[in-house]
Amino acid sequence: MRKVFQFFFTVYGFLIFLFLMVILLPCFIYAFLQKPVKGGNMIYKISRWLANVFFFMTVIRHQNIYEELHDKTKEYIFVSNHISYLDIPMMMKVIRGQNVRILGKVEMNKIPIFGAIYKRGTVSVDRTNAKERSKSINELICFIHKKISVFICPEG
């Protein structure tokens, strides 16, 4: 019985995600048409709203518990494990009021429509090519110099 519930809940969550993506597509397109930094920041603001609505509609609750509050006026390198599809939406809920870029795998850029949004909002890394990995690190450093925090998931 539990497996059946998990299956239907997964399908429900996926349909909610698709519905929200379709509703927000004009906002993502507008953000995509902006300059790279401004457009990327807009994508994260839209994604934070999407995460709030998604978690509300799927009745998933969370509570932020900080060992120490960080200064939102400074840039940081956030590091986390990434083992679930919910990790990134949860990260959207945790890192608030601060611009951020995620280091993400280049393979995600190939997904129709989502890939274009993903590419604008992340720093893509081709893990099979040492030169491209180095280029991605340099791009992250540039974002830090622009006062934008970065988020990496070394195990994801």
Q: What are these model-derived regions, one by one?
A:
Residues 2-64, 116-120:
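A transmembrane-helix-recognition feature enriched in membrane-embedded lipid enzymes
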Residues 57, 61-156:
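Soluble catalytic domains of membrane acyltransferases
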